[in-house]
């Protein structure tokens, strides 16, 4: 009798020596018993390292901030969820009854987390070389399509993509003050980011400009950019 997981292994292009690791990687926290959160943590670190290393060699002239933004595009949840859907990972997830009924097997965050957990499982199964080979095989097409020009996005977009790549809530912007005459106003905006304990601030001649300045400050505070890219 064939093992249903063999089909997923063929799609992933990897055969587990210890298939229990694969099962654990596909087990959501809503399912009774052990779950994939620790493997997800490990896989996230490996994914960021491997993609960072690949970008470092692929774009020798790119600056640190550009490399960070390119990496954020490749490792964001949307990208990983697309991979998972291509492999039909959702069909193999072990979910609690509530998540199953609510369509958790289609949810972007759950699919992205499962892909990271599978990366962690591959690493534990046969080591870094295997994990690197699979990551590059899966994300190679997207990697080859990137150019440093892709980083020429405004700070709000870059901040949003970075937070999405970490599975975080989107930033919240609030106008806290408006000064000056109607024809020459200055807007003061706060930006609240889940990963930062303090809000960042920006001001400018329009709400849009003030939000961009606050977003740029958040990127610096997060260590994603150094303020000179």
Swiss-Prot record:
Keyword DNA repair: no
Residues annotated as binding Mg(2+): 40, 113, 116
Required cofactor names: Mg(2+)
Broad class of where this protein is predominantly found: cytoplasm
Compartments, record wording: Cytoplasm
Catalytic activity: Endonucleolytic cleavage to 5'-phosphomonoester
Domain RNase III: 5-127
GO BP of this protein: mRNA processing; regulation of gene expression; rRNA processing; tRNA processing
Annotated EC: 3.1.26.3
SUPFAM superfamilies found in the cross-reference section: dsRNA-binding domain-like (SSF54768), RNase III domain-like (SSF69065)
Cited InterPro entries: dsRBD_dom, RNase_III, RNase_III_dom, RNase_III_sf
Function of the molecule: Digests double-stranded RNA. Involved in the processing of primary rRNA transcript to yield the immediate precursors to the large and small rRNAs (23S and 16S). Processes some mRNAs, and tRNAs when they are encoded in the rRNA operon. Processes pre-crRNA and tracrRNA of type II CRISPR loci if present in the organism.
Protein name: Ribonuclease 3
Organism expressing this protein natively: Pseudomonas paraeruginosa (strain DSM 24068 / PA7) (Pseudomonas aeruginosa (strain PA7))
Gene name of the encoded protein: rnc
């Amino acid at each position: 009798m064939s093992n249903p997981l063999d089909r997923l292994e063929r799609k992933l292009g990897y055969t587990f020596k210890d298939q229990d690791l694969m099962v654990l990687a596909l087990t959501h926290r809503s399912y009774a018993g052990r779950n994939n959160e620790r493997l997800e943590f490990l896989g996230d670190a490996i994914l960021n390292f491997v993609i960072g290393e690949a970008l470092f060699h692929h774009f020798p002239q790119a600056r640190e901030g550009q490399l960070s933004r390119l990496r954020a595009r490749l490792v964001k949840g949307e990208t990983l969820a697309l991979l998972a859907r291509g492999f039909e990972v959702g069909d193999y997830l072990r979910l609690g009854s509530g998540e199953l009924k609510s369509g958790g097997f289609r949810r972007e965050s759950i699919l992205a987390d499962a892909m990271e957990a599978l990366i962690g499982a591959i690493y534990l199964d046969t080591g870094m070389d295997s994990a690197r080979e699979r990551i590059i095989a899966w994300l190679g097409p997207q990697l080859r399509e990137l150019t440093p020009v892709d980083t020429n996005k405004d700070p709000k977009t870059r901040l949003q993509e970075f937070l999405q790549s970490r599975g975080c809530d989107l930033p919240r912007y609030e106008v806290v003050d408006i000064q000056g005459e109607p024809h020459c106003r200055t807007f003061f905006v706060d930006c609240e980011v889940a990963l930062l304990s303090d809000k960042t601030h920006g001001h400018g001649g329009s709400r849009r400009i003030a939000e961009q300045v606050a977003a740029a400050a958040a990127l610096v505070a997060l260590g994603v950019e150094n303020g000179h890219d």
